[in-house]
Amino acid sequence: MEKYDEDIALQASKFLEDLSLCDGHSRLYGPVGDMLLSNDHILVADHRGRRLNGSLTQYLPHSSSDKVYPLGSSQLRSMNGSRGDGYMDEGIYKSDVALPCYSGISEKNKRYSAELYRHSCGNSFEGVPISAKQGGITALYSGGKMSNSCMSATSPRSSMASSASSSQEHSKYSSPRSSISSNALSLDKFSSPRSSLVVPGQQEKYTSPRSSLGQYEGGVLSPRSSYASTTSDTSKHSSPRASLTSYDCGSKPSSNRTSGISMGYDQRHISPRSSTASQYSCTTSPRSSYSDSRYVPSGNPDLDGVGGHGSLVSPRSSMCLQEGRSATLGSCNPSVVSPRSSISSHSSRSSRSSRGSMGAYTDLTVPSPRSSMLGTSLQEETLVQDLGEACHYKVLTQSPPRQEQHQTITSSHDLNSGAVASYNFSSAKGSATVHRFKLPYQVTPSRESGPSQAERRLEALTLELEKELELHMKKEYFGICIKCGKGVYGASQACQAMGNLYHTNCFTCCSCGRRLRGKAFYNVNGKVYCEEDFLYSGFQQTADKCFVCGHLIMEMILQALGKSYHPGCFRCVVCNECLDGVPFTVDVENNIYCVKDYHTVFAPKCASCNQPILPAQGSEETIRVVSMDKDYHVECYHCEDCQLQLNDEEGRRCYPLEGHLLCHSCHIRRLSVNVPPHQPPSYPMHVTEL
């Protein structure tokens, strides 16, 4: 079936050649023997034919002597897909603007019309207006020999049209609604009427009136799928919602909503919204801001004559940066820059284009009248060999530029356009070298990881301001730091240890400098160490030994009376109670006692009751009565006979008799038995306090 369709296409093309209404071979060439295109052969579209966002009206052909009119007067189809009156009975639509195909050899002395059939999904559509004017830019196209004409058709609504030469004789046509035209290598591939990307192969290629990009060989995918990988050699129709097609000689049906399918080989398409195209991509994002193009062949080595690869710069492009890395004989690569592209980088060995970014084909550039900055030497050289000889392309990547015998042909028949495209052709034989153009631009260097210098400076200034604010703020005064001798302000700066006041930054480990506020520390010979340095750095050799047990004190230390103790070893020798945090006392032999046991052992005893005289409850003072060189409790110092409390008052004084405590009355009574001739003298009472 495919072969049958192929034969029908061949017969149809031959039939159109025989019915061509174009003039003969004599008007194609000028008086010079070389192939110089006449200005009358430049086909332009009426500037009033379309608006950027309006409806499409009928295109008026240029009023030149070599007009090419369609077979029937018809009107272009409207943009909403409705069929106009111009459709024929057979479903073939005639376009008002056609591309004249200029033959370059004697065997084909005819100029063919572009009234060609367009097939899409089994339906025939209109022929494509090959030449269109966007913003006053004129496109020039020419053909090759043996029907190997490479025609690049730019739609009035297309942002970019690119084509590649081929020795095949099959024609591939995209849908009128396709964004990008695509044709495969050997089989007829028909894209969906709503496909978003159609990539022309190595045959004659015609882009749709709504095509955004004509790219190299490949299939067609749905406009709503992100990626589709095609590796089949057979002809398969993809989904009408496919977005992008990988070009591996065919197309496979892809999912309608595929988010990501990996591509085969090195020919990959970038997502329609990616910012930068990879170096192996052929089609960049329609909204990418910059695209670099590499590793894509630029021409067909079998083409002879002047190639029809022109480079069109969009009217609103800001900068067109072009790098010529190869020179071709009789062929130029077309590059159409998007209307709002910022920088377009062109390389003759690559082709990358985006609807909103750039188009990359070099060697012939038509500057835009609205472009902000274009290279001064964007008109590149092309050498044309004699018509009868076979032409071979030699790619020179980095050869020194040279120029030979230029002839300039300026296209002048441009209606309502503000720009004239200049083309330089060289009649000399041999390989041509292309100038390398570099326009001045500045790229913001990538920032290293971490904060930038400005951010660090800002942080430093912020810290300085915070410190100044802290100094000026009124804070609580704690005292003088014992280490630095400066005042301590604020609770965050105060640290108390070993009974002294420090700044938080002053009380640090003398070994590692770590701040010890709120951490365990060790004081060794007046130096403070953190726990890690003290335990694991050999400082345990200098640690004190417990006075009681004789072991090293590795944890908390308790110092008393010039000696060091473990807290658990500091106990009363009588009751064995821990005296950590409890009042204690020692004897002359450095034995430790609690207060109670100390008084029990060392307190004076009452001569009356023979009990120790202890301090009163809640008091540390001991009150006792000393009489006749004896110690008495206050309550024990009374008369033994009448129990009268004795003191220094008159009538209560003590009159001892034979070692007994007696008052004056009781003393007389005991003496009345043996009345003495004289009254015995009384003894004074002394009250002492310990």
From Swiss-Prot:
GO terms for molecular function: metal ion binding; transcription corepressor activity. Belongs to the zyxin/ajuba family. One of its GO terms (cellular component) is P-body. InterPro entries: Ajuba-like, Ajuba-like_LIM1, Ajuba-like_LIM2, Ajuba-like_LIM3, Znf_LIM. Residues 151-316, 328-372 are annotated as: Disordered. It is found in: Cell junction, Adherens junction; Nucleus. Interacts with prickle3. Residues 479-540, 544-603, 604-673 form the LIM zinc-binding domain. Keywords: Cell junction, Cilium biogenesis/degradation, LIM domain, Metal-binding, Nucleus, Repeat, Repressor, Transcription, Transcription regulation, Zinc. GO terms for biological process: cell projection organization; cytoskeleton organization; negative regulation of hippo signaling; neural crest cell development; regulation of cell morphogenesis; regulation of DNA-templated transcription; response to hypoxia. This is Wilms tumor protein 1-interacting protein homolog. Pfam families: LIM (PF00412). Signal peptide: none annotated. Gene3D superfamilies: Cysteine Rich Protein. Residues 204-214, 223-233, 240-261, 272-292 have a biased composition (Polar residues). Residues 152-186, 335-357 have a biased composition (Low complexity). It comes from Xenopus laevis. May monitor slit diaphragm protein assembly, a specialized adherens junction characteristic of podocytes. In case of podocyte injury, it shuttles into the nucleus and acts as a transcription regulator. Plays a role in the regulation of cell morphology and cytoskeletal organization. Acts as a transcriptional corepressor for snai1 and snai2/slug and plays a role in regulating neural crest development. Involved in the organization of the basal body. Involved in cilia growth and positioning. Its main location: other. CDD domains: LIM1_Ajuba_like (cd09352), LIM2_Ajuba_like (cd09355), LIM3_Ajuba_like (cd09438).
